[in-house]
Amino acid sequence: MFMGEYLHTIDGKGRLIVPARFREALGERFIATKGLDHCLFVYPLDEWKVLEEKLRALPFTQPEARAFVRFFFSGATECELDKQGRILLPANLREYAQLDKDAVLVGVSSRVEIWSQALWANYSRQAEDAYASAAESLVNLGI
């Protein structure tokens, strides 16, 4: 399980250090793709396979499902850790997530999210404001 928040710098070649706790759970190879809210989603291979099966089961005749699956998979790339525990983020993913120098890696249960520091700060402020009302809504779902 992934949890916590870590700030790291992306070097000039587009490499990002993955925190040691995340490296252990991700393994040597994993998948990074375009996430929601302009962050990147990073999945261990076993989690990716489960998600892939669910997405393949969506009806491709529905425009929303087709668009989501297309966008999600078009950004997906297999990543591998180097000897220093870094990953090379492709330019298209860095551009999508507006990553230039400072990145925040966030553990979100079954995945890691990679955010630009500025977008994460903005998102966190908004999420903090909505946190209490979201908790109240989740009570209705039995959580």
Curated annotation (Swiss-Prot):
Keywords assigned: Cytoplasm, DNA-binding, Repeat, Transcription, Transcription regulation
A single cellular component GO annotation: cytoplasm
InterPro entries reported in the protein's UniProt record: MraZ, MraZ_C, MraZ_dom, MraZ_N, MraZ_sf, SpoVT-AbrB_dom, SpoVT-AbrB_sf
Domain (SpoVT-AbrB): residue spans on this chain: 5-47, 76-119
Subcellular location per the Swiss-Prot or TrEMBL entry: Cytoplasm, Nucleoid
GO MF term list: DNA-binding transcription factor activity; transcription cis-regulatory region binding
CDD domains per the UniProt record, alphabetical: MraZ_C, MraZ_N
Biological process, per Gene Ontology: negative regulation of DNA-templated transcription initiation
Xref: PANTHER family: TRANSCRIPTIONAL REGULATOR MRAZ
Complex formation: Forms oligomers.
Family to which this protein belongs: Belongs to the MraZ family.
Name of this protein: Transcriptional regulator MraZ
Taxonomic path: Bacteria, Bacillati, Bacillota, Clostridia, Eubacteriales
